[in-house]
Amino acid sequence: EKKSAEAATVLLEEFCSLHGYGKPDFGAYQSFFEAWITTPHAPEKSSNYRRDLDLSSGVATVRYELDGASHLREAFCSDPAGVAVVRLSADQPGQITFILDATSLHKGVEVTAADGELMLAGRVDNGKGNPPGMRFEGRIRVRAEGGTVAAAGKALTVKGANSVVLLIAGSTDHKLEHPDYQGGDPATINRATLDAAAKTSFDDLLAAHRRDHGALFTATTLRLDGVSREDLPTDRRLAEYKKGRADRGLETLVFDYGRYLLIASSRAGGLPANLQGLWNNTNSPPWMGDYHLNINLQMNYWPAGNTGLSECFEPLARWVKELAKPGAQTARVHYNAGGWVAHHVANVWGVTAPGPKRGVHMLEAESAAFICQNIWDHY
């Protein structure tokens, strides 16, 4: 009867609540913890500092020279091993000395150091008080060649090592399984993960990571003829490009970077890429770092099949399959209908109801069909 505005008002009042998206009980994609490496190196005394990220191998490196020694740091996140790996080395013996500690934005975390491991454990604020929310633990195991490793309060000290490998594991007790979403003990999971990784040398961990990452990254190659300013660092290339100077190599680099982000954010067995990706240094990210089903989540995965990253689609398909379970309840309660439904926003806890009362866009009941189009197109 051409009363869409009136209908929207009724729906907002009857269907939407004061809970959900943007509220403490909805949750957010939050920072885990930060590991800090404090060295005695004076920045003003170092030279030839360089850092880079190799998109094709997924390895980040830092190089610099200090007091006649060349220092190298290599870092990567291994999907096969389930750990982040950092190696600090130098071309002269006994050069690696640092303090390792950890901090978190979450309140009430417990940090301990013992037996060559640094551990940080806590529970998130669920917006409801007691009992608190999801449990989490981060654990770093230190393997040193030469030198000493010792606990010093809530930190580890490494002195005079030739090289050091840090194996980093992080887990929570969340499990993507409706209705309780309850997984195992994060400390137990981390110990098992680190024990398995510790049986493998750094070189073998790196080789396995390169094979795994490289198989995905090299599945598609984009080549554009024309000028390529590969002699310049990336920040300079971006600045020059904004001035209108052609750089076809930069355009292919951005294409490769987009694929790299999806490879890093969406691997089998994990959660799909959210509005924030993996990189987040706050407990209150934009849009809660959730899943917007009105187009954002769909856009994250549009390039997957087209650019040779079909393997990265699995987390989205599995998440949607689990979302359909609470979505069936929402369809019955809100619409007296079969099938399943979701609305504007969702999260990792199966939220499918409309709301809160923030506008008519919260009533987008077609969101389930929209995200299923991704699955239809993929399969």
Regions found by a protein language model. Give the residues of each.
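Aromatic-residue-lined binding/catalytic grooves and analogous aromatic/hydrophobic interfacial grooves
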Residues: 1-359, 366, 377-379
